[in-house]
Amino acid sequence: VKVMETGSISIAAELLFITQPAVTKRIHSLEDYFGVKLFESAGRGIQPTHAAHSLLPKVKTWLNELGEIHHTLSHEQTQVQGRLKIGTSHHIGLHHLAEPLKKFVQLFPQVTLDVHFVDSEQAHEQVLAGELELAFLTLPPAGDDRLSYVTIWNDPLVFVSAPFHPLAKQTQLNLEDLIAYPSLLPAAQTYTSQITLSEFEKNGLKPKITMSNNPLESIRMLVSIGLGWSVLPKTFLNEDLKQLDLNLKMNRQLGMVWHPARIQSRAAEELIQLM
């Protein structure tokens, strides 16, 4: 599964904390067992065969079921232990999670915390698919009825530019003023971008998007050198950014999501309670 997800034996080995020869040996063992070729050489890399693509969804289902068996058995133990696989957006991981996770690992030293930095939208899908037990992310404007959400942090969004940008010198701006200048927004599928674009759509407007980028830290740098205006969390403001004088309040909700229909490990339950 890891080799198919990454397209690389070496990267898969790093993620699994084993050697490349060990990964190759396991692949050959699977090929011998099933009597089919799972990967073929392609230049300097490898590519999965049709058989591998056919096998992948069944393997993922089996891994999810195996994980639920582990979670069920964890409730029979008095000690909270085992591996807890969680996801977090880069922004939340860098700005909000350090202290809570530090407290968690001190309270439950027998738990191996497996933290994956992913985009909020990707984390949402991985929780839905059972690939993550729990994720910390920007909550979607419209949630999925199959998942449970808890808002933890309110994250105000502000319009920003470089201090020397023409918009920074103006007062009482409106959205019409902004569309005359290039904007730097997150990719259209991101929740932050959806929140921003919906405000323009309400007014029948469309911003002039010259560049879409992720993560937000990259956008902050591009804005600071004068390439355009953007919408960023208010916590990003510093001497390199100027909040634009626009009478419009926008917020995004940051929190956690999990799948209530799946059996939660005791470690996941404890982290949910801690948060």
Model-derived features: where do they sit?
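Central regulatory/effector-binding core of bacterial HTH transcription factors
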Residues: Q81-A142, K206-N213
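Alpha-helical linker/hinge and terminal dimerization helices associated
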Residues: Y33-F34, L55-Q77
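Secondary-structure junction motif
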Residues: T138, P182-N203, Q264-I272
